[in-house]
């Protein structure tokens, strides 16, 4: 996994996409890749991706997410970043964290991308104002594709500013397809 304290492992999947000098010239942006502490999560939940009754904390952010929120506001202040242009993206456990953060702190984010993640459907309605682009591989054996399908279905009923892309014949590594997307 990408957890730990080396400040490198979180760059394994997608890091080079954003770090390439040629890519950065196309975007006037700051990009951060926070690393989740070892043996912890981006959201406060006990996860069993194969059942629908994951146990979630309905209100509190995880310690990791609280630190991330503090970092975001610190960077906004220090670098004069437009607070209306803050976007979040996560894959796998980070996809869960993306949904959790947009559900509990929708005031922060202008948009979100969740790749092969899942959501707490009982509070996801709070994230409806944040446009989401949700990606998943149809053959994912780590996080069932149904998790993303359900999230998209719920969000779409509440607001039309959401996109869903499902990759045929693709397993958990759907981020490889995402980073190859022309529109991405």
Task: Name what the model sees in each region.
Residues 45-92:
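Gly/Ser-rich "nucleophile elbow"/oxyanion-hole loop immediately N-terminal to the catalytic nucleophile
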Residues 2-65:
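Active-site machinery of serine-nucleophile hydrolases
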Residues 58-66, 103, 142-146, 175-178:
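Soluble non-cytosolic domains of exported or imported proteins
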Residues 5-10, 42-47, 100-101, 124-127, ...:
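Short, solvent-exposed loop/turn and secondary-structure capping segments
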Residues 27-29, 127-132:
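Short, proline-enriched alpha-helix->beta-strand connector loops that line the catalytic pocket
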Residues 115, 122-123, 131-135, 139-184:
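C-terminal catalytic histidine-bearing segment of alpha/beta-hydrolase fold enzymes
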Residues 73-80, 84-126:
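Primarily recognizes the serine-hydrolase "nucleophile elbow" in alpha/beta-hydrolase
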Residues 1-5, 76-79, 91, 98-103, ...:
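Cell-envelope and extracellular/periplasmic
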């Amino acid at each position: 996994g990408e957890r730990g304290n080396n400040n490198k492992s979180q760059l394994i999947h997608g890091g080079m996409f954003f770090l390439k000098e040629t890519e950065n010239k196309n975007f006037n942006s700051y990009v951060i890749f926070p690393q989740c502490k070892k043996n912890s999560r981006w959201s406060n939940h006990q996860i069993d991706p194969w059942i629908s009754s994951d146990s979630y904390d309905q209100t509190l952010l995880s310690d990791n997410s609280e630190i991330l929120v503090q970092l975001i506001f610190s960077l906004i202040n220090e670098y004069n970043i437009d607070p209306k242009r803050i976007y979040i993206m996560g894959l796998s456990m980070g996809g869960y964290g993306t949904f959790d953060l947009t559900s509990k702190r929708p005031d922060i984010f202008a948009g979100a991308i969740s790749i092969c993640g899942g959501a707490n459907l009982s509070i996801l309605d709070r994230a409806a104002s944040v446009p989401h682009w949700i990606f998943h591989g149809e053959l994912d054996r780590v996080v069932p594709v149904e998790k993303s399908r359900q999230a998209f279905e719920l969000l779409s009923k509440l607001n039309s500013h959401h996109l869903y892309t499902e990759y045929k014949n693709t397993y958990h590594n759907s981020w490889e397809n995402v980073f190859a997307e022309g529109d991405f």
